[in-house]
Structure formats: C-alpha cells, structure tokens
From Swiss-Prot:
It is found in: Mitochondrion inner membrane. This is Cytochrome c oxidase subunit 2. The chain crosses the membrane at residues 15-45, 60-87. Its main location: mitochondrion. Mg(2+) binds at residue 198. It comes from the Eukaryota. It holds the Pfam family COX2_TM. Cu cation A1 binds at residues 161, 196, 200, 207.
Length: 227
C-alpha cells in the first residue's frame, strides 16, 4: 500500500507489477540521459562564445538526430509492447470473479460458485477499529487464493468507474454495457488496497477496494463458510 509522502511506486506484489516497475526504471533512465544531454547543450550555448555563423548545413548531424531518436523510441516501445501483451494474456484461470461498479460501492460475484456474491462498502470513519485505514477499509473484503491466475470481469451498473489495485498492477475501466477483463496473480499473501480511479460522482473518493490474498486451503475454507 502507499504511505504518506511516498515518492516511488508501491511494492510490486504480482509478476505484472514487477515488469511495470522495471519498465518504469528503464524508461526513466533514458529520459534522464536525454535531459542531461539537452541541459549540457543549452549550458554550452549560453557560456561559450564559439559559434559557426557561416555553417549552412550539417548532414552528419542531421542524420544523427534523426536516427538516434528512432532507436530510442524502439528501445522504449519493444518492452512496452511485451508488457502490454502479458497484461492481456489469460491462461487457464482457476477462478473468475465478476466485479460491478455502482454509485458508490462495488459488488462481487464468484461465478464458479452458485450463491457466492456480496456488496462491498467503505467503512465510515466513525466505525473504524484501531489499526484500520481511513477511507480504505471495506465491510466485505474480496478473498482470493494467492499464487494462482485469477480472471476479473469488470463492468458497471450506472456510470464509468475504474477498478484499480496499484500494487498488483491493475487498472481496468468499468463501463456500463461493456464487460472488460483483467488477470491477477499475487506473489504473496496479504491485504492489497485500491480505489475507484475514474471520477464517478460526489462520492467517488469513497469507493475503496480491498483484496485479501490467502493460501488456497484458507480460501477453500472461507468459500465454504460463505455459501
């Protein structure tokens, strides 16, 4: 989860988020090198008196500043396309959960079970227990098995929402009349927090998401008790 004054990304808890973090560092390094070069050129132009007023063209330089940006864009695009393909790929999910956005709460349905469904509302500040997080706790958490591929089907009953859990690298729009899908796999157990990431009305800030990733045996016990 995020912390106050945090500057970096949240700790990666899924293979996709690890790839996104590495890609972020890769792209940031390229941007840093380009910015350093541009600042060096600007400072050199401001401080030196050596100019070439008689130079009309420089084909070598023009070739370099045409080819080099193309190479840089390719170096950015190739890993980006690879991650994009990985995010859309869903291989034999063990569980499917349907998520519906409402103003202003989420509802969940475990489609592999006949009657396992519930609504998830934010816990009001006055009802929080010691240690619980303001604006992030819900009355019903989404319990899922860890280290297994899970498919999320995401849609909306009213307006546009967005189902997002940053530490798992998830952000999928919930659009009325359209069913989007995403896949998630958690590397470790724990609580993972997210929020609606699309402005959807006056209570947009009060639509938290809490995923509780547990071992498969614990998930089976929980699902049995809920049915």
């Amino acid at each position: 989860m995020a912390y106050p004054f945090q500057l970096g990304l949240q700790d990666a808890s899924s293979p996709i988020m690890e790839e996104l973090t590495n890609f972020h560092d890769h792209t940031l390094m390229i941007v840093f090198l380009i910015s350093s070069l541009v600042l060096y050129i600007i400072s050199s132009m401001l401080t030196t008196k050596m100019t070439h007023t008689s130079t009309m063209d420089a084909q070598e330089v023009e070739t370099i500043w045409t080819v080099l940006p193309a190479v840089i864009l390719i170096l950015i695009a190739l890993p980006s396309l690879r991650i994009l393909y990985m995010m859309d790929e869903i291989n034999n999910p063990v569980l499917t959960v349907k998520t519906m956005g409402h103003q202003w709460y989420w509802s969940y349905e475990y489609t592999d079970y006949e009657s396992l469904c519930f609504d998830s509302y934010m816990v009001p500040t006055n009802d929080l227990k010691p240690g619980e997080l303001r604006l992030l706790e819900v009355d019903n958490r989404v319990v899922l098995p860890m280290e297994l591929p899970i498919r999320m089907l995401i849609s909306s009953e009213d307006v546009l929402h967005s189902w997002a859990v940053p530490s798992l690298g998830l952000k999928t729009d919930a659009i009325p009349g359209r069913l989007n899908q995403a896949t998630l796999t958690s590397n470790r157990p724990g609580l993972f927090y997210g929020q609606c990431s699309e402005i959807c009305g006056s209570n947009h800030s009060f639509m938290p998401i809490v995923l509780e990733m547990v071992p498969l045996k614990h998930f089976e016990n929980w699902s049995t008790s809920m049915i």
